[in-house]
């Protein structure tokens, strides 16, 4: 069987196994008997402040539990205007992704419209993580029963029209595969040049992957789309998987704190039920929530401690390195390769992990 056919036939179970290898490796921070790391115990009171400027955003998401928690974080910001949420296949199929986004926004008291986007990837392959997030993407906890329906119209057209009507004002916060964004760039390249910035939760950063040893799931799900986005010339900030390890992971005690809040906190805690089971079954007592961390990078300037300009290239050829994103760091001298690229991304290299959970907790109360 050739590699392309093999990738197209990959099962959810196989993907879950691939996810596990990296996720659990990232979660191997030594913990106390209560499951809380020493660093988390000593920095429990740390928080950072959200942006004080008015922000116009479109959130593009493949809504699973982690995406929903990020939507809630954004919806609770006083200075953030969510112009719309565009959804696509990724963690779950398009219909589930749509319902999950509607449910999260409804609970958070946000009436931003939700637009359906891509039900497929650019190359026709579909990979999802049902075995990680549950069949409904929200922990199979009976949380998804939205009263509203998706807005009329296509997500890609909504992105293009909104950017056109708000030139140099709209930030795209991309929490899943880049399919909707790539289609918008292909369809209206001139209009999309008016995007203020793209914030992407994607790539392995400078660390290991979770879909494969070198690839992160959001890129792996549609590498061709991610390459189009990277090559577009639009201003992009990337938050990689490597930012989500150690103290940035959530413990059982922290999730219990969320559940005690009732309302949005309880919703988030319950939606993480299946992924907590998945992590525990594979030897980890903490869980990643990369999407909320990426949202915090976008909306809380003080949360990001350091960045580096890079040239990022995405490998789209079939093989072991499929969907790996390679970063050439500005100012770094390589022994052989000449580092004279046009730098197309800002890569986040350090965040205030110790403030992550408490900032999230304060925001959604």
Ranges and model annotations:
Residues 2-14:
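Bacterial N-terminal signal peptides that target proteins for export
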Residues 21-25:
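C-terminal motif of bacterial Sec signal peptides marking the signal peptidase cleavage site
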Residues 29-54:
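N-terminal, intrinsically disordered, polar/charged segments of Gram-positive cell-envelope systems
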Residues 50-55, 73-82, 220, 224, ...:
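Conformational coupling and interaction surfaces
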Residues 50-61, 65-103, 136, 142-245:
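Active-site histidine-anchored catalytic micro-motif
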Residues 104, 108-115:
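A glycine-rich helix N-cap at a beta->alpha junction
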Residues 114, 229, 295:
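A residue-level signal for conserved active-site and pocket-lining positions in enzyme catalytic cores
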Residues 115-146:
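Surface-exposed loop and adjacent secondary-structure segments within mature catalytic domains
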């Amino acid at each position: 069987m050739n590699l392309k056919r093999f990738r197209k036939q990959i099962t959810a179970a196989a993907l879950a196994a691939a996810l596990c290898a990296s996720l659990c490796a990232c979660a191997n921070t030594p913990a106390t008997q209560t499951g809380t790391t020493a660093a988390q115990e000593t920095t429990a009171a740390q928080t950072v402040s959200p942006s004080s400027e008015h922000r116009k955003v479109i959130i593009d998401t493949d809504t699973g539990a982690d995406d929903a928690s990020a939507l809630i974080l954004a919806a609770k910001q006083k200075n953030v205007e969510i112009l719309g949420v565009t959804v696509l296949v990724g963690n779950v199929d398009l219909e589930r992704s749509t319902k999950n986004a509607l449910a999260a926004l409804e609970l958070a008291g946000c009436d931003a419209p939700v637009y359906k986007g891509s039900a497929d990837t650019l190359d026709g392959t579909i990979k999802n993580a049902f075995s990680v997030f549950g069949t409904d993407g929200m922990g199979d906890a009976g949380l998804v029963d939205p009263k509203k329906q998706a807005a009329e119209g296509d997500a890609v057209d909504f992105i293009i029209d909104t950017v056109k009507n708000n030139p140099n004002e709209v930030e795209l916060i991309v929490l899943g595969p880049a399919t909707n964004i790539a289609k918008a760039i292909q369809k209206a390249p001139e209009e999309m040049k008016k995007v203020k910035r793209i914030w992407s939760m994607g790539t392995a950063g400078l660390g290991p992957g979770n879909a494969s040893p070198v690839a992160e799931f959001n890129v792996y799900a549609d590498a061709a789309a991610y390459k189009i986005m990277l090559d577009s010339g639009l201003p992009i900030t990337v938050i990689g998987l490597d930012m989500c390890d150690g103290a940035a992971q959530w413990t059982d005690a922290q999730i219990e704190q969320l559940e005690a809040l009732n309302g949005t906190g309880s919703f988030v805690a319950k939606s993480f039920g299946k992924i907590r089971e998945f992590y525990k079954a594979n030897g980890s007592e903490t869980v990643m929530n990369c999407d909320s961390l990426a949202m915090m990078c976008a909306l809380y300037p003080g949360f990001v401690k350091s960045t580096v300009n890079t040239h990022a290239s995405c490998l789209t050829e079939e093989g072991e390195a499929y969907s790996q994103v390679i970063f050439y760091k500005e100012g770094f001298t390589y022994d052989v390769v000449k580092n004279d690229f046009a730098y197309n991304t800002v890569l986040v290299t350090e965040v205030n992990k110790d403030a992550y959970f408490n900032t999230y907790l304060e925001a959604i109360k």
